[in-house]
Amino acid sequence: MRDLFVVGIVLASLPITLIRPWVGVLAWTWLSLMSPHRYCWGFATTFPVAELVAIATLVGCLSTADRQPIPRVWQVGVLVCLWSLFGITTTVAFNPDPAFYQLIEVSKVLVMTFATVVLINDRRKLFYWVVVIALSLGLVGLKGGIFTLLTGGQHRVYGPPGTFIGDNNDAALALCMTLPFLYFLPRLVRGLDLGRWWAWLGRAAPVLTLFTAIAVVGTYSRGGFITLAVVLVALTWRSRYRVVVAGVMVIAVVVGAGMVTIQWKARMGTIETAEEEDSSFRGRLGAWEGARNIARARPFTGGGFHAFQGWVWDAYFPPEGQGHDVHSIYFEMLGEHGYPGLAIFLLLLGGSFLQAERMRRRARRLGNTEVETYGAIIQIALAAYAVGGAALGKAYWDYFYDLIILLVLVHTLLPLAADG
């Protein structure tokens, strides 16, 4: 029944997508972030739902007049440069066949990224897209939070297997990045005249925020816990009621400290001694050293996609790093695409973070709550990605590029943001 439900929704969306391709962007975002078909147990797990939606969206995009030109902003140029570099490094990759396959996968993400820029062309569509982002992972957080409470935190929270959030650490990062979307969603709902039906979303968002934070704790991810702390501090600082929010968080921490399991406390207790006692962490350090060695040998191209495997381990990695993925967005870019790849990636991440801050400050000064809220969401989500991604290989993840495009769209569609 679950399989029929998910596939039925996808198939029903296809004719709508051909007529209104921006709906396909919403469906694609839902499928790429939440991967609902991976929660099924039958034929839906391998059914090409994302591919069908992508094809319908692109066909509709070519035939519709309801679209805008690609905005002339610096992020678009940087994305094109990064995409071009991916193509160049693939031609000289250590492992050509896996590298070419990964280039195709990354290209699919970037094609849909540019389709999003073209098709989300007004304020309401932008809001609907943000709601889809928030709920796609907010529902995962709700499920994980309930699971954590019902089991007393005895078991770890995972995402659906075979997805970008299948691992507990990956799920923790995704949920941390989603917290600002959920936290600020009521403010966006109040700012738009969408009718009473949408009021439920504003009331449900705080509940989703709470359960999502609980789910992060339930992942047992040390990196996720550190990222959660960063996000909670940022949310408190950006809140209009800092004292109240800080008080609630202090109470939650005190209560939560008495509820967490001995296993969880022991796991978090290894953060300070990870380098000496944790073989997994030592393996990551070795993998990072291997990435640096590749960059020293091939500073302009790196080893290409999927460089960290096979004979490359023996040639470039210290013994403790062999057999490990690089587990870092920064060292992943450095090892696979050299110093140019890392520089472009940092420009995209850091430049967008700073632009979101400038946009937020100007909007607050001029009293534009909507733009201020979007700026805060983007900035905190990027901060979560920058912190949590330091120990995870998620440089090609859809979610990061969604954040960049969200900033581009806010800059393009909301005049106050564009003036900043």
Q: What kind of feature is each model-predicted range?
A:
Residues 8-17, 57, 80-91, 104-112, ...:
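Alpha-helical transmembrane segments of multi-pass inner-membrane proteins
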Residues 41-42, 92-100, 217-218, 390-394:
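Membrane-interface helix caps and helix-loop-helix hairpins in membrane proteins
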Residues 55-60, 246, 250-251, 348-351, ...:
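Transmembrane alpha-helices of multi-pass inner-membrane enzymes
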Residues 1-3, 44-52, 101-102, 164-178, ...:
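Membrane-interface micro-motifs in multi-pass membrane enzymes
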Residues 261-272:
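Hydrophobic alpha-helical transmembrane segments in integral membrane proteins
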Residues 1-88, 97-101, 121-131, 136, ...:
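Transmembrane signal-anchor hairpin modules in multi-pass inner-membrane enzymes, especially those
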Residues 154, 158, 162, 272-289, ...:
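Long extracytoplasmic/lumenal interhelical loops at the membrane interface
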